């Protein structure tokens, strides 16, 4: 069958279409994988309300995605909404608009989000190596720890790029650093992982992390380059220092830079650097497979 996943995030809205390989097979083939920046979660950190214009533009993108699904004879479309919709008191206004399009819609917990990211990033891996999968989003960041093909331990923390853009209007990066480490330290799971003697590898998913490769190399986005790339803490720190000292117009000259990411990429890079510092890790492996694949597996296989 041909199935579709729509991931409705705080900053972006993504469409993933794939075809399963027979009724009893666990294999699937990607057909479509696209993203649009919709900023559904703008202002939600403070107001807890989804902005009317943000709702309208996100639903317009979902309408476009539905047409793409129809053009590819998709049998079922399933949408998953994350942090912004979770936090909003007026989430029903958005949910009803999506459901009118004939889409199976779910508002998921941060734990479910983290499990999907872990599954997507590790489902092709074998062996006894443990992984900590990190998914930096606009409203929250998920940390998922465990072995491939097992159910990971997950914590979702309300630290994300859109939140930080809004918070930085009233605080400095020095204050943000303290805030990040306080939020990470509150998690019993993360403190436990931090103190472990066993070896584990960091895997980073989503554009804030994978995009660091192309900022560093000054080349256009190419998932074949970023997937599996070992991103060093020195590269991340260098990217932050460079981005921080650039104007938004200068950031736009970076070949891979999306015009709607020029503001969020700076606090996002800062967050990634602080996460590696927290865990005392020098490298994180980038993965272009993430919660889209994870959701597809759990929904259709």
Predicted regions: what they are:
Residues 25-44, 60-63, 70:
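Conserved ATP-binding subdomain of kinase catalytic cores across diverse folds
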Residues 11, 75, 282:
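Short acidic/polar active-site loop segments enriched in Thr and Asp
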Residues 1-29:
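N-terminal basic/disordered segments at the start of proteins
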Residues 76-81:
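Short beta-strand segments at enzyme active-site cores
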């Amino acid at each position: 069958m041909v199935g579709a996943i729509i991931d409705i995030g705080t900053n972006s809205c993504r469409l993933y279409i794939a075809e399963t390989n027979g009724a009893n097979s666990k294999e699937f083939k990607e057909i479509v994988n696209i993203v649009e920046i919709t900023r559904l979660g703008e202002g939600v950190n403070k107001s807890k309300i989804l902005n009317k214009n943000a709702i309208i533009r996100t639903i317009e993108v979902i309408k476009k995605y539905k047409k793409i699904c129809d053009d590819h004879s998709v049998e079922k479309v399933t949408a998953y909404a994350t942090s912004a919709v979770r936090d909003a008191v007026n989430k029903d206004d958005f949910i009803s608009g999506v459901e009118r399009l004939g889409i199976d819609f779910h508002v998921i917990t941060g734990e479910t989000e983290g499990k999907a990211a872990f599954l997507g990033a590790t489902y092709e891996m074998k062996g006894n190596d443990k992984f900590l999968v990190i998914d930096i989003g606009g409203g929250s960041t998920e940390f998922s720890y465990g072995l491939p093909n097992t159910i990971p331990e997950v914590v979702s923390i309300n630290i994300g790029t859109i939140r930080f853009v809004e918070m930085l209007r009233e605080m400095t990066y020095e204050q943000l650093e303290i805030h990040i480490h306080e939020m990470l330290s509150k998690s019993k799971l993360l403190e436990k992982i931090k103190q472990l003697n066993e070896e584990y590898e960091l895997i980073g998913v989503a554009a804030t992390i994978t995009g660091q490769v192309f900022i560093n190399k000054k080349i256009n986005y190419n998932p074949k380059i970023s997937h599996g790339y070992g991103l060093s803490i020195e590269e991340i720190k260098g990217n932050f220092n460079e981005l921080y000292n650039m104007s938004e117009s200068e950031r736009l000259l970076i070949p891979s830079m999306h015009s709607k990411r020029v503001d969020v990429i700076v606090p996002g890079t800062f967050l990634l650097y602080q996460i590696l510092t927290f865990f005392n890790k020098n490298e994180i492996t980038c993965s272009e497979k993430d919660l889209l694949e994870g959701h597809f597996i759990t929904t259709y296989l």
